[in-house]
UniProtKB/Swiss-Prot annotation:
Protein known as: Protein RecA
PROSITE patterns named among the record's database cross-references: RECA_1, RECA_2, RECA_3
Subcellular locations according to the entry: Cytoplasm
Primary site of residence: cytoplasm
Keywords per UniProt: ATP-binding, Cytoplasm, DNA damage, DNA recombination, DNA repair, DNA-binding, Nucleotide-binding, SOS response
GO cellular component, one term: cytosol
UniProt cross-references to SUPFAM superfamilies, sorted A to Z: P-loop containing nucleoside triphosphate hydrolases (SSF52540), RecA protein, C-terminal domain (SSF54752)
Function statement: Can catalyze the hydrolysis of ATP in the presence of single-stranded DNA, the ATP-dependent uptake of single-stranded DNA by duplex DNA, and the ATP-dependent hybridization of homologous single-stranded DNAs. It interacts with LexA causing its activation and leading to its autocatalytic cleavage.
Recorded GO MF terms: ATP binding; ATP hydrolysis activity; ATP-dependent DNA damage sensor activity; damaged DNA binding; single-stranded DNA binding
Organism annotation: Bartonella tribocorum (strain CIP 105476 / IBS 506)
Disulphide bond pairs: none
Domain of life of the organism encoding this protein: Bacteria
Length: 347
């Protein structure tokens, strides 16, 4: 039997059974589209992700220790999506969202939908309904660890219910994945870290909610606080490191560092200076920073203040950095070295 005729017959049968478009050639011109992205609020992280930001129509996981900047990063993504006219929602399972801080990061509270569900099932049902609507561009679930199953809430404190949350997440993600892709909605799950008992070799760290999220996520970001930023004796922010642990859309394992300033969020000006020095756009001589023979200031903080007062020079540096994104990405990959986080498994 001729293979071409057999294939045509099979394709016709599939289309009769499941509708036109249920199977197609991947290279058909009208079907191939670029993946839409949402900027993260961090220029270096956008470059490290390889596609200019976080992908729409995919699941993203942001995890790390307490007070490392997980929610801050998610709120920056919401603010960037809103700037582009997107509709965003925030499922606050932890009941801990600070609207004043969110506004300072640039979030438009008037157009942000928020839900504070009582149970994990309720949170995931609301998530599914919003995703299926096709009207939401970015949806954040904060956090997976706070998605408490109804059986656990109704039970006694001492009840042992092993694997209940993992089963809940596994079922929810099976249902959500196709809807997320069809609606082109990005769902960001914020997750916490736990320690595995009795681990002799490798990292004892793991994330909550079982393994399903590791499989379904297209991008996984490990965010850590690596130091403090001081203004004289007062701590005014955190030095933060983000590692792209998994990336289905570009090479993973790139690592970036940026500042998170209390009450302001990610310091864009600090990134412009750091990345500029790496690529050679900003010159550093001793403690002095300069750009195109124009002195920016002595010391990093003075250089940041100069860029704050001269927005046109900051815009010039940002444009030059975006034009050198490929070079920066290679450097970020080299800087990541061979450090492993949670085995760096790409699942």
């Amino acid at each position: 039997m001729d293979k071409t005729k057999a294939l045509d017959a099979a394709l016709s049968q599939i289309e009769r059974s499941f509708g036109k478009g249920s199977i197609m050639r991947l290279g058909q011109k009208e079907q191939v589209v670029e993946i839409e992205t949402v900027p993260t609020g961090s220029l270096s992280l956008d470059i490290a992700l390889g596609i200019g930001g976080l992908p729409k129509g995919r699941i993203v996981e942001i995890y790390g220790p307490e007070s490392s900047g997980k929610t801050t990063l998610a709120l920056h993504a919401i603010a960037e999506a809103q700037k582009g006219g997107g509709i965003c929602a925030f499922i606050d399972a932890e009941h801990a969202l600070d609207p004043i801080y969110a506004r300072k990061l640039g979030v438009d509270l008037e157009n942000l939908f928020i839900s504070q569900p009582d149970t994990g099932e309720q949170a995931l049902e609301i998530t599914e309904t919003l995703v299926r609507s096709g009207a939401v561009d970015v949806l954040v679930v904060d956090s997976v660890a706070a998605l408490t199953p109804r059986a656990e809430i109704d039970g006694e404190m001492g009840d042992a219910l092993p694997g209940l949350q993992a089963r809940l997440m596994s079922k929810a993600l099976r249902k959500l994945t196709a809807s997320i892709f069809r609606s082109n909605c990005m769902v960001i799950f914020i997750n916490q870290i736990r320690m595995k008992i009795g681990v002799m070799f490798g990292s004892p760290e793991t994330t909550t909610g079982g393994n399903a999220l590791k499989f379904y996520a297209s991008v996984r970001l490990d965010i850590r606080r690596i130091g403090s930023i001081k203004d004289r004796d007062m701590i005014v922010g955190n030095q933060t490191r983000v590692k792209v642990v998994k990336n289905k859309l570009a090479p993973p394992f790139k690592q970036v560092e940026f500042d998170i300033i209390y009450g302001e969020g990610i310091s864009k000006l600090g990134e412009l200076i750091d990345l500029g020095v790496k690529v050679g756009i900003v010159e550093k001589s001793g403690s002095w920073f300069s750009y195109n023979s124009q002195r920016l200031g002595q010391g990093r903080e003075n250089a940041k203040q100069f860029l704050r007062e001269h927005a046109e020079i900051a815009a010039e540096i940002e444009t030059a950095l975006r034009q050198n994104a490929g070079l920066i990405a290679i450097e970020l990959l080299e800087n990541a070295g061979s450090e492993n986080t949670e085995g760096d498994e790409v699942i």
